[in-house]
């Protein structure tokens, strides 16, 4: 028999040989506590009544006052006994509840241990290591495949990377020189704008006078 079977017994329900279960015993103790608590309340009321009666009779009826005080003392004694009994029962109930809790905890731990054992029955540490190695190999293979797929393929066309870079640098230099020439070219001086208003022409009469003078000059030169 396993250690848990020795602790809790094979039957599991009733404690050994038909005895009460912890739950039944705990419930009975609680019922007893409730009964004694009600008895306490009753005795406290009786003590209050006898004290009132003793004060009422006082010096008028000493015999009745003394009887009331005697009854009060008896009730107080019973109340003290019940207080002690309640303390004992409360201690016993708490101990039983703790024991029952520990029992349930151990049962559940045993149940979990059996479940774990059953889960590991078909496992072998060497097989686990082999499986983890297979997983690592497959992951590595997947990485290699992904890298191969993502690598650009020229489909038979191969180019010299250095030659392409040199050509690119040459094109960049040509473009740079062109931009510099455009920036440092001859500066053009803007011409003045042509006036939009037409200049006044010579008067027609003045032009005729000049023509007459020229003719007169020609005639004088011919007569000499």
Swiss-Prot record:
Tagged with keyword Transferase: no
Classification via InterPro entries: Snf7_fam (IPR005024)
Name of one Pfam family that matches: Snf7
Localisation: Cytoplasm, Cytosol; Late endosome membrane; Midbody; Nucleus envelope
GO function terms (MF aspect): cadherin binding; identical protein binding; protein homodimerization activity
Coiled-coil parts of chain: 23-183
Gene3D superfamilies xrefs: 6.10.250.1710, ESAT-6-like
Keyword Nucleotide-binding: no
GO biological process: autophagosome maturation; autophagy; exit from mitosis; late endosome to lysosome transport; late endosome to vacuole transport via multivesicular body sorting pathway; macroautophagy; maintenance of lens transparency; membrane fission
UniProt region (Disordered), positions on chain: 1-23, 185-224
N6-acetyllysine PTM sites in chain numbering: 6, 114
Membrane association type: Peripheral membrane protein
Modified residues (N-acetylserine): 2
Tissue and organ distribution: Widely expressed. Expressed at higher level in heart and skeletal muscle. Also expressed in brain, colon, thymus, spleen, kidney, liver, small intestine, placenta, lung and peripheral blood lymphocytes.
Regions of compositional bias (Gly residues) in chain numbering: 8-19
Modification type Phosphoserine: residues: 184, 223
Highest rank taxon of the organism: Eukaryota
Oligomeric form and interacting partners: Probable core component of the endosomal sorting required for transport complex III (ESCRT-III). ESCRT-III components are thought to multimerize to form a flat lattice on the perimeter membrane of the endosome. Several assembly forms of ESCRT-III may exist that interact and act sequentially. Interacts with CHMP6 and CHMP4C. Interacts with PDCD6IP; the interaction is direct. Interacts with VPS4A; the interaction is direct. Interacts with VPS4B; the interaction is direct. Interacts with CHMP7. Interacts with CFTR; the interaction requires misfolded CFTR. Interacts with PTPN23.
PANTHER family: CHARGED MULTIVESICULAR BODY PROTEIN, CHARGED MULTIVESICULAR BODY PROTEIN 4B
Disease: Cataract 31, multiple types: An opacification of the crystalline lens of the eye that frequently results in visual impairment or blindness. Opacities vary in morphology, are often confined to a portion of the lens, and may be static or progressive. In general, the more posteriorly located and dense an opacity, the greater the impact on visual function. CTRCT31 includes posterior polar, progressive posterior subcapsular, nuclear, and anterior subcapsular cataracts.
Notes on the domains: The acidic C-terminus and the basic N-termminus are thought to render the protein in a closed, soluble and inactive conformation through an autoinhibitory intramolecular interaction. The open and active conformation, which enables membrane binding and oligomerization, is achieved by interaction with other cellular binding partners, probably including other ESCRT components.
Protein name as annotated: Charged multivesicular body protein 4b
Organism in which the protein naturally occurs: Homo sapiens (Human)
């Amino acid at each position: 028999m396993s250690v848990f079977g020795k602790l809790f017994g094979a039957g599991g329900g009733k404690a050994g040989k038909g005895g009460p279960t912890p739950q039944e015993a705990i419930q009975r103790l609680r019922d007893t506590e409730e009964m004694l608590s009600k008895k306490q309340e009753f005795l406290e009321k009786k003590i209050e009544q006898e004290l009132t009666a003793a004060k009422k009779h006082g010096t008028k009826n000493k015999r009745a006052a003394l009887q009331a005080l005697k009854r009060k003392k008896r009730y107080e004694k019973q109340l003290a006994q019940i207080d002690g009994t309640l303390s004992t029962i409360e201690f016993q109930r708490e101990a039983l509840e703790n024991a029952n809790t520990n029992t349930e905890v151990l049962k559940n731990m045993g149940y979990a241990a059996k479940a774990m054992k059953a889960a590991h029955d078909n496992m072998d540490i060497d097989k686990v290591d082999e499986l983890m190695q297979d997983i690592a190999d497959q992951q590595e293979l997947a990485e290699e495949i992904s890298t191969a797929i993502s690598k650009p393929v020229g489909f038979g066309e191969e180019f010299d990377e250095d030659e392409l870079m040199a050509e690119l640098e040459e094109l960049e230099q040509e473009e740079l020189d062109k931009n510099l020439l455009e920036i440092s070219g001859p500066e053009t001086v803007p011409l003045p704008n042509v006036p939009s208003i037409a200049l006044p022409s010579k008067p027609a009469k003045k032009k005729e006078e000049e023509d007459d003078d020229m003719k007169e000059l020609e005639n004088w030169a011919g007569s000499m």
